[in-house]
Each structure stands twice: as C-alpha cells, then as structure tokens.
C-alpha cells in the first residue's frame, strides 16, 4: 500500500464509479483529494462521505478547467496527482448511422475534456518538478468495439495524448500513464443496451466485470512515488481480453 501523506490529488468524475473508488483509495492512503465533477449534488454528497473537497467543473469548458486549476492550487497549494476519470459512453450505433451531434458530444467529454485537464494541471506540475497523471482510457481504445465507434475512437485518442505528454515531460519527475480497463459495473452502462453489455462480458476471459476497487489499486500504484520510471505507458486491466 502506497503512502500519500502530504500529497494532493485531483480526480475528475470523482463523484461516482472509478473516480469515487480511486478517491476513496487515495484518501485511505493519506492523500488530500479534490473531486472535480459536473454533478454538483452527487459531488457534494461524495465530498461529505469521503471527507474531501469538491469543485463543480464542466471539463468540456476550457476556461472552466483553467479556473478550477487555479482555485485548486489556491486551496491545496499544489496538485501532485491528476486522475482523469470523467467520461461518457455515448449511444450504440453503427458507424454509418452514428449521429454527428452524439459523436461530437463523446469527443468533447472524452478527448477535449481530458486534454484541458492535462494541459492546465501539468503546467503546475512542471513548475514543481513533480507529478503523476493517470488518464482512464479503455480496452475499446485498443481493440475497437462494434457499434461504439465514437467511444472507441475517443479512448484511442486518450492513449495517444498520454503517450505524447508522457514523452514531453519525461525529463522531469512527472509520470503520465493511462489504463485500459475492461468494462466495470458503473453508471456508464446505463447509456448502452443490454445486448452490448452481454457482448462486452463475453469478450473477457475472466467472464466478469472488473471491479472499481481493482482499477483503483492499479491507479494507486501509478500515482505513487514508487512509479518512478514508467511514463507514456498503457496499462492493461482487461481480464485477459487484450491482445497487445
């Protein structure tokens, strides 16, 4: 178990799902956590439950993310760790039937939002000479899921962003990595059909969902000082589904 005493973390989408489990894990390991989430009601409930701080942030708004970064620095003095967990699945359509507005919505949240968070937070890390960034991608970003081209392509973009930023910051003690989990049982599944859920489980040799706690354990290592060498990496947690 890593020791995060004296460290601070920002977790986007921290009010639920993977973000919530990660916030809980890091707090239990001694970290001071600030949750960024668009759901104010749930975010405030989570902050009380976990005894952490909360900011309502729409990560698709470039200016809002910049302001949230400034507010967080004022409140917490620094940001040692950034976990980008906020994301959406989007609807399930074939690529030729995919509504353009829905495609844009998925990319705005999953790609632009992650870019904004990485962009502004990493600047503060470069000033301090230390940081850990973990972006939540997906096995879909490596393999591509049928009827989920927007989600799959957006998560592939997160992998590419992670690799680029990791190389750009490698000369400092800043590690930028992403993880590619299989499906976890979170509210994001409310956005897709049961047929699609059954398909995803059928592709996992473990024959079950990954738990959010299992994902949080991997994130905790990547967020720790023990992860002192690996950067620009893609860490699989797909229960055997990944082919590379």
Predicted stretch roles:
Residues 204-215, 226:
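A conserved structural motif in NAD(P)-dependent oxidoreductases
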Residues 118, 154, 162:
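Active-site helix of classical SDR
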Residues 138:
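Residue(s) in the substrate-gating loop at a strand-loop-helix junction
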Residues 96, 143-149, 171-172, 207, ...:
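Active-site loop immediately N-terminal to the catalytic Tyr-X3-Lys motif
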Residues 93-95, 99-104, 189, 200:
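Substrate-binding pocket helix/loop in short-chain dehydrogenase/reductase
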Residues 123, 167-171, 228:
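Alpha-helical segment proximal to the catalytic Tyr-Lys
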Residues 89-92, 143, 231-244:
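Short C-terminal tail/terminal secondary-structure segment
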């Amino acid at each position: 178990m890593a020791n995060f005493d004296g460290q601070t973390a920002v977790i986007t989408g921290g009010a639920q799902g993977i973000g919530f489990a990660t916030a809980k894990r890091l707090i239990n390991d001694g970290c001071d956590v600030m949750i960024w989430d668009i759901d104010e009601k749930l975010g405030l409930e989570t902050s009380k439950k976990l005894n952490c701080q909360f900011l309502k942030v729409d990560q698709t708004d470039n200016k809002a993310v910049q302001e949230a970064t400034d507010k967080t620095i004022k409140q917490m003095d620094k940001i040692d760790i950034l976990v980008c967990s906020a994301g959406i699945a989007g609807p399930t359509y074939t690529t030729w039937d995919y509504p353009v507005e829905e495609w844009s919505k998925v990319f705005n949240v999953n790609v632009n939002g992650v870019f904004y968070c990485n962009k502004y937070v990493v600047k503060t890390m470069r000033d301090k000479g230390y940081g850990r960034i973990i972006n939540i991608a997906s096995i879909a970003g490596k393999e591509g899921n049928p009827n989920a081209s927007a989600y799959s392509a957006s998560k592939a973009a997160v992998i590419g962003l992670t690799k680029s930023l990791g190389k750009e910051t490698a000369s400092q003690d800043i590690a930028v990595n992403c993880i590619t989990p299989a499906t976890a049982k979170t509210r994001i599944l409310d956005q897709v059909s049961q047929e699609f859920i059954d398909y995803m489980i059928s592709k996992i040799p473990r024959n079950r969902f990954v738990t959010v706690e299992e994902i949080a354990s991997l994130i905790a290592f990547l967020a720790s000082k023990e992860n002192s060498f690996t950067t620009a990496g893609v860490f699989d947690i797909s229960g055997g589904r990944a082919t590379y």
